[in-house]
Amino acid sequence: MGNNVVVLGTQWGDEGKGKIVDLLTEDAKYVVRYQGGHNAGHTLVIDGEKTVLHLIPSGILRDNVECIIGNGVVLSPDALLKEMAPLEARGIPVRERLFISEACPLILPYHVALDQAREIARGNKAIGTTGRGIGPAYEDKVSRRGLRVGDLFDKVAFAEKLKEVMEFHNFALVNYYKVEPVSYEEVLEQAMSYADLLTSMVIDVTDTLDAARKRGDKIMFEGAQGTLLDIDHGTYPYVTSSNTTAGGVAAGSGFGPRHLGYILGITKAYCTRVGSGPFPTELYDGLEKQDPIGKHLGTVGHEFGATTGRLRRTGWFDAVAMRRAIQINSLSGMCLTKLDVLDGLEELKICTGYQMKDGSLLEVSPMAAEAFEEATPVYETMPGWSENTFGAKTLEELPQAALNYIKRIEDLTGVPIDIISTGPDRNETIIKVHPFQA
C-alpha cells in the first residue's frame, strides 16, 4: 500500500489535478504543494459549489487534511491572504490547517512589475506568463538575492536586504524597461504587515513530513501546471519557471525521493494549452485556427484558464508528448479527465508520431520548442460515440467505443489508466485502482 502519492499534470497544465487531489484526499493526512505559485489554478466542484484555488493546496476543503506549502513554491503573501479570506468566510479554519515553509521565496510587488514590463517589451514574442511575478521571484532565488518567508521575522535585516534588491530591480525598470520604479517604503510597510499574519503558519516542513512518514500518515504531493511546462523538460522557452515534474517533489518539499510511492499522471482525453508555444495537435485557438471540433472541445470543456481567464487552445490527444511525460515522471498510472467532452463526436484522432522535416518519424517528443514547431502529427483515427458518459461512475456505464479509446491510449503509452473523470464534481469519477491502495 502506497502512503505517499504524487499527483501531477502530464500535458501543458489545466488537466484537472485539483478535482483529483480533492477526491483522493479523503484518505490523506497531508497535501503538499512543492512548486509554482499563484499562477496555478485548481478548480474544485463539490455538490455543485465551485472553488478555485491558486496557492492553497486542494485538500483544504477536507476537515481531515493538513495543507503544506513547501520551499519550492514562490509565495505571494498578498495573494495568499486574499485567497484565505473567502474560505475563512465560509467557515473553513484555514489558519489552523495551512502551514508554510520558512524557505519559500517571497513574491513582492517589484517582481510583478518586472514580469509585466518584460512581457510588454517582448511584443509578439511574449512567453504568455500570468504576469504575477513568478519568474522574477525564481530568478532572485537562483541568484541568491531573493527574500524568503523566514526573513520577514527580522525587520532590521529584512529592510536592509529589501533595499539592496530593490535598487537592483528598480534600476532595470527605469533604465531598461522605461517604466516607473516601485516604492521601497510601500513594499517594506506592506511586507512587515505580513509577518504577524503568517508567523503561526510557518513550520519546518522537512521535519514535519519526515515525522508523518514515520507515523505512517498518508501524504499527497500536489503538482501545479504540467510536465510540458517544466523549466528543464518542457517546450523551452515557452515554459514556467519551476520543475513541474516528479523530480521536483523532493527538491520542493524536502521529502526524501526514496520514500515517494505511487505517481499519478493527470491527462485530459484531448489536449489544451494556454498562452504561447508549440502545440502539434492544435485544432482551435480562437484566432487563426478555427476547426469546429477544436471549438467543440473548448466550448463543451469550458476551456478558459482558472487563473488568467484566457481561452485555452485545443487539440487531439498526443501520445507522442505523453510518452515523454511518462519517461520523465516514471508514472505508476494515469487519470484520464474530461472523457465526457468527447461525447457526440463521430470520429476521434490520436497522435501516434511526429513526422519531421528531415523525413524522420518520432515516437517520443523532442525537447526544444523549435523541433516541436516543425513536427507534423501522424494520426490514428477511431470511431467516437453518441452516448452520454457525463457523470458515469462505473466502467459498465461507458459505451464500448469509449472503452476502446481508453484501451488504445493505454496500449500506446504502456501505462494503465487507473482513474477516469466524467464530470467536474468529485463523485463523477471511475476509480479502477486507488493510488493509496496500489
From Swiss-Prot:
This is Adenylosuccinate synthetase. GTP binds at residues 13-19, 41-43, 312, 338-340, 421-423. IMP binds at D14, E15, G16, K17, N39, A40, G41, H42, T130, R144, Q225, T240, R310. GO terms for molecular function: adenylosuccinate synthase activity; GTP binding; magnesium ion binding. Disulfide bonds: none annotated. Substrate binds at A306, T307, T308, G309, R310, L311, R312. It comes from Aliivibrio fischeri (strain ATCC 700601 / ES114). Plays an important role in the de novo pathway of purine nucleotide biosynthesis. Catalyzes the first committed step in the biosynthesis of AMP from IMP. Mg(2+) binds at D14, G41. Its EC number is 6.3.4.4. The active site is at D14, H42. Keywords: Cytoplasm, GTP-binding, Ligase, Magnesium, Metal-binding, Nucleotide-binding, Purine biosynthesis. Homodimer. Pathway: Purine metabolism; AMP biosynthesis via de novo pathway; AMP from IMP: step 1/2. PANTHER family: ADENYLOSUCCINATE SYNTHETASE. Its cofactor is Mg(2+). It is found in: Cytoplasm. Gene3D superfamilies: Adenylosuccinate Synthetase, subunit A, domain 1, Adenylosuccinate Synthetase, subunit A, domain 2, Adenylosuccinate Synthetase, subunit A, domain 3. Belongs to the adenylosuccinate synthetase family. The gene is purA. GO terms for cellular component: cytoplasm. It catalyses: IMP + L-aspartate + GTP = N(6)-(1,2-dicarboxyethyl)-AMP + GDP + phosphate + 2 H(+). Binds 1 Mg(2+) ion per subunit. HAMAP family: Adenylosucc_synth. One of its GO terms (biological process) is 'de novo' AMP biosynthetic process.
